[in-house]
Design a protein with these regions (language model features):
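Carbohydrate-binding surface patches
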Residues: 137-184, 216
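Flexible loop/turn segments at secondary-structure boundaries
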Residues: 6-10, 37-42, 83-88, 171-174, ...
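Solvent-exposed beta-hairpin/edge-strand motifs
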Residues: 180-197
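Glycoside hydrolase catalytic-domain groove-lining segments
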Residues: 1-43
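C-terminal beta-strand-rich structural cap/linker in extracellular carbohydrate-active enzymes
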Residues: 202-226
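Alpha-helical scaffolding within the catalytic cores
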Residues: 13-21, 58-66, 145-150
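Aromatic/acidic polysaccharide-binding cleft in carbohydrate-active enzymes
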Residues: 29-142
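Active-site-proximal beta-strand/loop segments in catalytic clefts of secreted hydrolases
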Residues: 1-5, 33-37, 78-82, 167-170, ...
């Protein structure tokens, strides 16, 4: 479980790498089988009070990114599907005064999870990302993770389909590009606080060498199938 490992943010990477290195000694795989927002997650106000916005969605996406990239988690699960006035459900259930029954509404957290789970299929392999700066110099290891900026990870499904997930945690747009060994087109899907952008199909691109990622958004890029 990833409870109590997300603050301070600077601690997220090191504690997961330590876990990864320990498990490697014993040839044991990691499944992250349960997590939700807790009281110590102060960056988003702790667990109390349901939140439908990108605030919680981005916070959890950063958690997923670190668990997959640095802990090498082979599986990742959220705590519960439907909840009340707490940040532990993908859906919020409530009963309005005088209403005959409950109302259920979705959240950006639900769709942010889909930026990963809808495209990265069982058996997928995570791929290494190598970064270069504007002068084409290779940047230090783990450059694809900026906890308050861009966080990128890439995967190959068993059928050869490539998936790239990019989190932009920053309050401003960020631009980045990717070079991949494929001539296939890419489909782009985005979750953000912009109206209607809940795992929304944005369009196709022939290449992804220069893409602008909107503020506070999660974008998935997927190669099209033949």
């Amino acid at each position: 479980h990833s409870y109590w490992t997300n603050t301070p943010v600077e601690y997220m990477k090191d504690c997961r790498k330590a876990l990864r290195d320990t498990l490697r000694k014993y040839d044991v795989e990691l499944w992250q089988s349960e997590v939700c927002i807790m009281g110590n997650d102060e960056e988003i106000g702790g667990g109390g009070g349901y939140d439908r916005t990108m605030k919680t969605a981005l916070y959890v996406a950063r958690m997923i990114h670190h668990d997959l990239v640095f802990a090498n988690a082979r599986s990742w699960q959220w705590w519960r599907a439907i909840g009340g006035d707490y940040k532990d459900g993908l859906l919020f259930r409530y009963r309005a005064p005088g209403a005959p029954g409950d109302t259920i509404v979705d959240s950006k957290l639900l769709w942010a999870l889909g930026n990963y789970s809808f495209f990265i299929r069982p058996g997928a392999k995570r791929l290494e990302l190598r970064c270069t700066d504007k002068q084409c110099r290779i940047e230090p290891d783990e450059c694809a993770t900026r906890p308050y900026g861009l966080m990128s990870s890439a995967y190959r499904n068993n059928d050869g389909q490539l998936v790239v997930v990019v989190i932009n945690y920053a309050p401003e747009s960020k631009t980045a590009g990717f070079t991949a060994p494929t001539n296939k087109h890419w489909k782009i899907y985005r979750t953000s606080d912009n109206g209607g952008e809940s795992l929304k199909y944005i369009g196709d691109k022939a290449d992804i060498a220069n893409i602008t990622f909107p503020p506070r958004s999660i974008t998935t890029l997927v190669t099209t199938q033949d």
